[in-house]
């Protein structure tokens, strides 16, 4: 019973942390915080946002067949874990959950490295999602790099604009 309580508490704390980080990124991307507030909030979550260039990448991924077998579900969960672990290995990427099927990645680095880190991220996602047994529907939307945190709202607006084209002009 004590273990159940501790497990439940740990899960609730993790959910709260994820919600809070998501809320923080919502505020940043909607332009609701000034730069000082962004850095203060980021410090609360031990997020280092220092860089000379920023970009956003949104990854939408879901299981190809909603009612797939347990094996297919496990394969899909493993796929998600592989993708997320890639981003967690590099300080140039800050990963956050955006919604049920979407993860956001803040890419932060020097301007001359931005194209490389962005392309590496896309290549890694593509490699994972197009593997023989991935069983995933996916797409990535990438913004246009900006030089200041205060400009992330513009980058986010472009990502939303680019993402809308997926529905207006499906492949």
Give residue ranges: language-model regions.
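Catalytic core regions of nucleotide second-messenger enzymes
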Residues: 94-100, 127-140
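Generic structural signal for well-ordered alpha-helices
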Residues: 122-126
